[in-house]
């Protein structure tokens, strides 16, 4: 929606000066980047599918970026702490330029704008398309918003701002870990996050190897620290783009089911299809999901047998065995 709000701002008198270079922090679509009048556009994003999509569209960027820019656009993410971190980072990337901050009301743009306004004057604000766009001159006064450092939570696990369950062990993952039967052989952890499940498997089960697949670059980096074991290998990949190099005896996973703030059960179903395609003939899938999510039909289509083996009022642990000749 950045394009819509920027267009509205220009129609109502906002002057956006042409500049040679602009960096976008956490854009979701190349059309939003194209909307900004700059000769060269770059981006920062840590979600692999988005990085791959924007790179394929001809934009330069990735989880980190070097250099300085004439302007920066912050596309506000869901995480409050990450959003503040991006504002500070934008000021570092465009220290002499204008910082544009865009987001939907459901993303917390109102509270972020108030926090920015308390530190530095705003140059302008527009409201459109259920969100806001505001802008200000870059300043070094946001240094306290930096959240690039790792944090240590319970049991010494390392996490970082903006990743899933950054403050504590996810309760669904904990239920799944406690429900696992003795595992052995080759394991895959799909959507591994910062590595809790894999750490548990490595600590409690005599496995030969475990491959962690995670799309969030920050989470994947944390998982390398939390699973510092020669049997573990971490892949920063999306579930669709990752190509397994072997078949697995077990897959463990706590798949995501949100696209932004909207629940998307199809995300979890894609994970189930991936698991069915990489398991051995007698392999097993262990997964945890929110109790209301409708995964049973997909499991019955792709596996010879499945059943619920644990859970509580919020979560269910599902065990599926013997994929039905499904190969990706």
PLM-predicted stretches and their roles:
Residues 127-184:
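SAM-dependent Rossmann-like transferase core, predominantly class I methyltransferases
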Residues 60-69, 236-243:
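Short acidic low-complexity segments
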Residues 71-80, 190-195, 248-262, 275:
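Conserved proline-anchored active-site loop of SAM-dependent methyltransferases
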Residues 46, 104, 214-218, 267, ...:
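Short beta->alpha hinge that forms the Motif I/post-I loop of the SAM-binding pocket
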Residues 120-152, 290-328:
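Class I S-adenosyl-L-methionine
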Residues 96-105, 282-289:
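Conserved beta-strand signature within the Rossmann-like core of class I S-adenosyl-L-methionine
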Residues 1-55, 171-253:
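Conserved SAM/SAH cofactor-binding pocket of Class I
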Residues 84-97, 269-281:
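A short glycine-rich, Lys/Arg-flanked "PGG" loop and its adjoining helix->strand segment in the class I
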């Amino acid at each position: 929606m950045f394009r819509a709000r920027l267009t509205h701002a220009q129609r109502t008198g906002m002057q956006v000066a042409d500049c040679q270079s602009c960096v976008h922090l956490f854009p979701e679509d190349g059309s939003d980047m194209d909307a900004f009048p700059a000769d060269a556009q770059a981006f920062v994003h840590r979600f692999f599918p988005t990085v791959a999509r924007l790179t394929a569209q001809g934009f330069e960027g990735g989880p980190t970026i070097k250099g300085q820019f004439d302007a920066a656009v912050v596309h506000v993410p869901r995480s409050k702490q990450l959003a503040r971190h991006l504002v500070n980072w934008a000021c570092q990337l465009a220290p002499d330029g204008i910082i544009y901050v865009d987001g939907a009301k459901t993303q917390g743009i109102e509270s972020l704008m108030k926090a920015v306004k308390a530190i530095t004057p705003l140059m302008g604000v527009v409201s459109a398309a259920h969100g806001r766009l505001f802008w200000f001159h870059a300043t070094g006064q946001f240094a306290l918003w930096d959240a690039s450092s790792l944090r240590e939570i319970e049991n010494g696990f390392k996490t970082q701002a903006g990743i899933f369950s950054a403050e504590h062990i996810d309760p669904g993952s904990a239920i799944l870990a406690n429900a696992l039967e003795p595992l052995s052989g080759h394991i895959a952890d799909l959507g591994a996050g910062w590595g809790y499940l894999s750490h548990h498997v490595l600590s409690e089960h005599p496995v030969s190897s475990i491959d962690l697949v995670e799309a969030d670059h920050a989470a994947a980096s944390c998982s390398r620290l939390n699973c510092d074991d020669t049997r573990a290998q971490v892949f920063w990949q999306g579930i669709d783009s990752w190509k397994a190099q072997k078949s697995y005896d077990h897959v463990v996973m706590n798949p995501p089911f949100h696209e932004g703030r909207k629940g998307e059960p199809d995300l979890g179903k894609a994970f189930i299809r991936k698991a069915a395609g990489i398991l051995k003939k007698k392999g097993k899938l262990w997964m945890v999901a929110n109790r209301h999510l409708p995964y049973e039909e997909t499991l019955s289509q792709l596996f010879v047998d499945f059943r619920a083996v644990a859970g509580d009022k919020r979560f269910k642990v599902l065990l599926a065995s013997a994929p039905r000749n499904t190969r990706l």
